[in-house]
Structure formats: structure tokens, C-alpha cells
Curated annotation (Swiss-Prot):
Gene3D superfamilies for this protein: 1.10.8.60, ClpX chaperone, C4-type zinc finger domain, P-loop containing nucleotide triphosphate hydrolases
Stored SMART domains: AAA, ClpB_D2-small, zf-C4_ClpX
Gene designation: clpX
UniProt keyword ATP-binding present: yes
Protein name: ATP-dependent Clp protease ATP-binding subunit ClpX
Organism: Rhodopseudomonas palustris (strain HaA2)
Length: 424
């Protein structure tokens, strides 16, 4: 039923699906003799999304087309259209190669691992995680800064394969078709141009150790993790068909690219990389293998990463969308927190723009948005549980800039500007 006919609530409307009243939900949508609340609409959308994702994975012998992959990436990742296209094609070709490698023996298709280059907070990790979710394959992440050569204090390279095996519930066959994302790959660049000066166990040494598993080898993985012991039984995992995606911010690489452009370009080509005010992401578009070698990656390692996808700095419009559009957008998260206190949280459009500009100034990208919102809402979240009668909190551009306090709107509407005075 959508209405209850008691004397005290005869005009109250109820959701026909979950039974909640109009006072318990934010929106109640009316249809012919039925009503549905915003929470049920969101639940239905989630169900449809999951079904679409399942049908996507099952189509074409389990290989979605590049356009299908890119379309799903669009639902989770804002912007970065060039990187999405590069990744969609590379991943499609990789799994097509796996499904057909036993059918044709005349041409052997080589594996194409991927290198993601982009500024901090541009979405490298999110892209890799979303790809694994789309394809329904085991996925693991590793931090390159914790890896060391075998025999030294730190994490063995083969522990990455162990984590992938754990993600596959120790199903070796599934693990061998998984995706490994290695973050902070730029931090293992060679510390010196002369490779023989010192033993570089966390730089060039790790690159050397990664070569074999990235190209394809049978790794002996101890089931319990940690260092190997002679008495242990090892699991044999073939890494030939595991897709490796490496990502890094590569701070300073833009200077190497720009220097190459200035030294090699003359005449009409001289303007390609010359402007110093170009954004880092735009300069990354022109990266060449020789730039990565100068940065400190060894030639063999660069050769194992034939597909390079560059990500751009997120502009103000993209950061505003990140704040509001995704399913778990930050603004939606804070609005849900305030709903628990029966208070509506509203951000003015100019306020969202100011938050985005702050993130750009700090050069933190999307990763810095949460800390900015946290600092803006700290005093409000501290005060509200002890205040009575507050119905809505409005965040304006002045609040973000620090020249005003949030506007508290009380239920009786008689004191709309109680907390809007400029802060000292």
C-alpha cells in the first residue's frame, strides 16, 4: 500500500516497495497508484548495473569489445579518455590472445604489459581496479617501494604472485589469467647512470627481479608467504598470461621530455614541447622510451612494457564531477553522514568549484579532495550532534575560501543566517 488511512497519518505517503514513509526518505516518486522512494530507485539501478556487467563479461566468449570496456570505465572514472582507449584496446587484445592461443600455432602473440604514467591523483589505480572488476579476474596490487631483491630485507617479488593466488582463492588456473598492478614503479628507477657503483637492491635490482615474472616464468610460490624454506611445498604458477600494469607519477619526467623536445626540434617542430606553462599530463603524451631510460628504468624493463598510457592533470570541471557524479562520490558520502543526524547537506556549485581549485593548487588531484572537504566540514561535524532544530547546512564558496562559516537553516525557518557571519 502507498497510503495509510489512520486518523493521524491519513495523508502520509509510503513507498510501495520498501514501505518507508515520505518522512523517512529524501524523495518519493509518484506513479499510477504506486510510489517509489529514491533508495529503492538506487537499489534497482545497482541491480541493473550488476546484470549488465555480468552479461558484458559473458559476451563474445568472455571478451568484451574495447568500446564496451571503455563504456564501463566511463561509469567509474571521470575524464582520461585517451588512457581509457589505450587500456581498453590493450586489455581486449590480451584476453583475446589467451582465448585463441591454442587454436592457431602459426603465429605466437606476445604479451603486452601496460605502463600508466600520470600525475598524483589522476586515476591510475582506479583504472586498474575497474578493469579487473569488469573482466571478473583475480586482481592484486603491489607497492614497488616495498620490494627488494631476493635475499635482502623487504618483500620478495614472488610475493606479488602469492597475493594474486590468494585473490584467486588459491585457484592456480584463475590466478594465471589475473591482473597485477604495481604502483609507484617510478620509485625503483636506477639511482645512478653507472650501474656498477653500488648494489642497488631496491632500484635496479628490483627491476631485474621483475623482468622474469613480467615476461613469463614458472614461479615457485610458498603458500604461507614470506621467505622460502627447503621443507616447504611450493605452488607452481606460470606468469606468462598474467597481465602486468605498472603505474607511477614519474615526477621530473616532464623536464626530460621537454629538454629532448628543445634539443631536437627546429623550425616548425620546435613548438611541440617548448612552452614551459604546459600541464604535466600534456607533456607526458610525448614520452618516448629514451626518456624512461634517462629517468632510470633499465632498457630490458622498458621493453617489457610496450603499451604506454598517459594520464592528464584533472581540470576543475573533472574534479567537480568526481565530487558529485560517481556512485560513491565524496559529496554523497558526507551527505549520508549528515542524514544520520537528520540534516541535509547542500553544496553550492561555486563551492564545488572552489574545492576543485584548491586541489589543483595543492597538486594532489582527486586524492586530495577528501582532506579538503574534511577540513571544511570539521567544525560543523563537531558542533552539529549537540545542536537542536538544524534542518539543513549550506556550504558556499566563501566557506571553502575560509571567509565565512557554514549556513545553518533551522526547522522553523526563522533564523536562516544564524551561522553565516564572517569568521575572524
Amino acid at each position: 500500500m502507498s497510503k495509510v488511512g489512520t486518523s493521524d497519518s491519513k495523508n502520509t505517503l509510503y513507498c510501495s516497495f520498501c514501505g518507508k514513509s515520505q518522512h523517512e526518505v529524501r524523495k518519493l516518486i509518484a506513479g499510477p497508484t504506486v510510489f517509489i522512494c529514491d533508495e529503492c530507485v538506487e537499489l534497482c539501478m545497482d541491480i541493473i548495473r550488476e546484470e549488465n556487467k555480468s552479461s558484458l563479461v559473458k559476451s563474445r566468449d568472455g571478451i568484451p569489445t574495447p568500446k564496451e570496456i571503455c563504456k564501463v570505465l566511463d561509469d567509474y572514472v571521470i575524464g582520461q579518455n585517451h588512457a581509457k582507449k589505450v587500456l581498453s584496446v590493450a586489455v581486449h587484445n590480451h584476453y583475446k590472445r589467451l582465448n585463441h592461443q591454442t587454436k592457431h600455432n602459426d603465429v605466437e602473440l606476445a604479451k603486452s604489459n601496460i605502463l600508466l604514467i600520470g600525475p598524483t591523483g589522476s586515476g591510475k589505480t582506479l583504472l586498474a581496479q575497474t578493469l579487473a572488476r569488469i573482466l571478473d579476474v583475480p586482481f592484486t596490487m603491489a607497492d614497488a617501494t616495498t620490494l627488494t631483491e631476493a635475499g635482502y630485507v623487504g618483500e620478495d617479488v614472488e610475493n606479488i604472485i602469492l597475493k594474486l593466488l590468494q585473490a584467486a582463492d588459491y585457484n592456480v588456473e584463475r590466478a594465471q589469467r589475473g591482473i597485477v598492478y604495481i604502483d609507484e614503479i617510478d620509485k625503483i628507477s636506477r639511482k645512478s647512470d653507472n650501474p656498477s657503483i653500488t648494489r642497488d637492491v631496491s632500484g635496479e635490482g628490483v627491476q631485474q627481479a621483475l623482468l622474469k615474472i613480467m615476461e613469463g616464468t614458472v614461479a615457485s610460490v610458498p603458500p604461507q608467504g614470506g621467505r622460502k624454506h627447503p621443507q616447504q611445498e611450493f605452488l607452481q604458477v606460470d606468469t606468462t598470461n598474467i597481465l602486468f600494469i605498472c603505474g607511477g607519477a614519474f615526477a621530473g619526467l616532464e623536464k626530460i621530455i621537454s629538454a629532448r623536445g628543445r634539443s631536437t626540434s627546429i623550425g616548425f617542430a620546435a613548438q611541440v614541447l617548448a612552452p614551459e606553462d604546459r600541464r604535466t599530463g600534456e607533456i607526458f603524451r610525448h614520452v618516448e622510451p629514451e626518456d624512461l631510460l634517462k629517468y632510470g628504468l633499465i632498457p630490458e624493463f622498458v621493453g617489457r612494457l610496450p603499451v604506454v598510457a598517459t594520464l592528464e592533470d584533472l581540470d576543475e570541471a573533472s574534479l567537480k564531477k568526481i565530487l558529485t557524479d560517481p556512485k560513491n562520490a565524496l559529496v554523497k558520502q558526507y551527505q549520508r553522514l549528515f542524514e544520520m543526524e537528520n540534516i541535509e547537506l547542500t553544496f553550492a556549485d561555486e563551492a564545488l568549484g572552489a574545492v576543485a581549485r584548491k586541489a589543483i593548487e595543492r597538486k594532489t588531484g582527486a586524492r586530495g579532495l577528501r582532506s579538503i572537504l574534511e577540513s571544511i566540514l570539521l567544525e560543523t561535524m563537531f558542533d552539529l550532534p549537540g545542536l537542536e532544530g538544524v534542518e539543513e547546512v549550506v556550504i558556499s564558496r566563501e566557506v571553502v575560501d575560509g571567509t565565512a562559516r557554514p549556513l545553518y537553516i533551522y526547522a522553523d525557518r526563522s533564523d536562516r543566517a544564524a551561522e553565516s557571519s564572517a569568521s575572524a
